[in-house]
Amino acid sequence: MQSLEQCVNSLEAIVHQLDGSVSRLARNGEASNELCEGILKIKRVFELVPEYDVESARLALFEEVDPMVKTLGDKIEKALIRKRRELENLRQTSELNSLRLSGDLYFSETGIDNQDMDVSTDAIAIASATDAELDELRALKARRAELQELLDGR
């Protein structure tokens, strides 16, 4: 309340000072009296607003903005979920491609024709696999590589 009183006092002081400036200009510039009256008129463009009106306007603004913010937050959350799913699918695709590449390397090194193997369902199986299944697949792949090294070493 004290700052409001300070604002009112400051505005009154400004109005008083402007009144004095206009009256001095009117006295000193009798020839340009029309200019002083037309351009230098004092216009009061401020008024005091009750605190109740300020609070009700603030509440109305919150009521208008809050639903928009919540809607935007929901949209962002859904987009994040979609992007996480897309990232997981890309990781699984990358894993599948690396498995295929390592399989192609194995077949090229051993000279075995990999055309006989049907891997057409591998993409579906790995794309729909869970993390635990992918971990098990990695472990089996590592075990297969170890066994192959043992066979190659003999």
UniProtKB/Swiss-Prot annotation:
Q: Does the keyword Iron apply?
A: no
One Gene Ontology term, aspect cellular component: cytoplasm
| Cited InterPro entries | DASH_Spc19
Q: Would you kindly state one Gene Ontology biological process term found in this protein's UniProt entry?
A: positive regulation of microtubule polymerization
Q: Which UniProt keywords apply?
A: Cell cycle, Cell division, Centromere, Chromosome, Chromosome partition, Coiled coil, Cytoplasm, Cytoskeleton, Kinetochore, Microtubule, Mitosis, Nucleus
Q: Which residues form a coiled coil?
A: 72-96, 127-154
What is its subcellular localisation?
Nucleus; Cytoplasm, Cytoskeleton, Spindle; Chromosome, Centromere, Kinetochore
Which residues constitute the signal peptide according to the record?
A: none
- Chief place where the protein resides: nucleus
Note the superkingdom of the native organism.
Answer: Eukaryota
- Sequence similarity: Belongs to the DASH complex SPC19 family.
PANTHER family associated with the record? DASH COMPLEX SUBUNIT SPC19 (PTHR28262:SF1)
Subunit structure comment from the entry:
Component of the DASH complex consisting of ASK1, DAD1, DAD2, DAD3, DAD4, DAM1, DUO1, HSK3, SPC19 and SPC34, with a stoichiometry of one copy of each subunit per complex. Multiple DASH complexes oligomerize to form a ring that encircles spindle microtubules and organizes the rod-like NDC80 complexes of the outer kinetochore. DASH complex oligomerization strengthens microtubule attachments. On cytoplasmic microtubules, DASH complexes appear to form patches instead of rings.
Describe the task this protein carries out: Component of the DASH complex that connects microtubules with kinetochores and couples microtubule depolymerisation to chromosome movement; it is involved in retrieving kinetochores to the spindle poles before their re-orientation on the spindle in early mitosis and allows microtubule depolymerization to pull chromosomes apart and resist detachment during anaphase.
UniProt name for this protein: DASH complex subunit SPC19
From the broadest rank down, the organism's phylogenetic lineage runs:
Eukaryota, Fungi, Dikarya, Ascomycota, Saccharomycotina
